[in-house]
Amino acid sequence: MAVNPGRLQAWFLACRPKTLSVSLSPVLVGTAVAWHDSGRILWLPLLAAAFGAAFIQIGTNLFNDVGDFLRGTDTPDRLGPRRATAEGWLGAGAVRFGAWLSFALAFLCGIYLVRHGGWPIVAIGLASLAAGWAYTGGPKPIAYGPLGEVFVFVFFGLVAVGGSYYLQTLTMTPVVLLAATLVGIHAAAVITVNNYRDHDGDARSGKNTLDVLL
């Protein structure tokens, strides 16, 4: 019989810390390419971008946790890690509040980044926040359709790597777009593997992911 975690541990698990590598690696790759090109690293933009990316990832994870619970897709027979809302460790309202709080912290990081990088960062930041909510928190979640991999490729590859490079150099180059493409493919592959694991449960609950359609 599984033992339920305490409240702090429940929040820790709900944030899904293992997924943070997927959101932080694009920031590091973009910064590494910028370092190669410019010979320097701007540490404050790097740290703000890393924390902002992590908070968006955590907020998206929490929206996913409560969204899947409310839509009935997190059933007792699902494979993979146990989910905080579905298991009753945390209330749906509390998890949703945690998601918005995480997005608010990401927004605060974005204020500094906008001061440094200007209007392009406004577009990147707002699009990233909207996408994080829409992935599973919106009325028609992206994760419930066949475009999840495309979404992840764009935001974890092109946007995150390119944006991190831009924060360091205030320019863009073909080389960083190539690096962004490679990182995006890797991130999309993570979603593909995850959806393959959840194939049977997704099919029963009406999630038409690319794996289910194929």
Regions found by a protein language model. Name each.
Residues S21-G30, V150-Y165, D211-L214:
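Small-residue-rich segments of transmembrane alpha-helices in multi-pass membrane proteins
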Residues V152-H199:
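Functional transmembrane core segments of multi-pass inner-membrane proteins
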Residues V29, S38-N64, V122-A127, P174-V193:
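Membrane-embedded alpha-helical segments that form the functional core of polytopic membrane enzymes
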Residues M1-L44, A48, P139-K140, V152:
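Topogenic membrane-insertion module of multi-pass membrane proteins
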Residues F63-L70, P141-V150, L170-V176, Y196-A203:
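A cytosolic-side transmembrane-helix exit/cap motif
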Residues Q9, K18-V22, L44-A48, F97-G98, ...:
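Alpha-helical transmembrane segments of integral membrane proteins
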Residues N4, P81-T171:
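Intramembrane alpha-helical segments
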Residues F63-F103, C109, A188-L214:
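Solvent-exposed interhelical
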